Amino acid sequence: MIRSKRKINKLRGSRSNGGGCTKKRRGAGNKGGRGNAGASKQHWTWTAKFDPDHYGKHGFKRPQKMIKKVNPVNLSYLEEQADNLIESGKASKDGDSIVIDVTELGYDKVLAKGKITKSFIISAPQFSASAIEKIEEMGGEAIEL
């Protein structure tokens, strides 16, 4: 049977809209709880349909001890700080070249950013390919530890 008016439209303005006493529709208790309450109980059908991955573990988290954070330094920084490093005893001069051990400064890798005008003998655990190229271009040496 086709209804000419929907029930809600018929009940407009009637204070309780077909819910009986007004007190009966108050609060979250009549809605089955607030928010996601009852997701595994009275609202399970909704959870199963619209949020099936809500329960259980998903994915994989790499152990933090397996992740090694690389602390890089640029050639431009070493160029700028060369004189200061020699004064403080963290670097030394060997003829025309400046000898630097990057691990003493707390770095793990040498990157090639910036131009260098001096000859360096740098020892580090890692170098970028372009850093090795720049160092050797100036007559220096890149020593991998």
UniProtKB/Swiss-Prot annotation:
Pfam families: Ribosomal_L27A. One of its GO terms (biological process) is translation. Residues 1-44 are annotated as: Disordered. Belongs to the universal ribosomal protein uL15 family. This is Large ribosomal subunit protein uL15. GO terms for cellular component: cytosolic large ribosomal subunit. Transmembrane segments: none annotated. Residues 1-13 have a biased composition (Basic residues). Binds to the 23S rRNA. It comes from the Archaea. GO terms for molecular function: rRNA binding; structural constituent of ribosome.
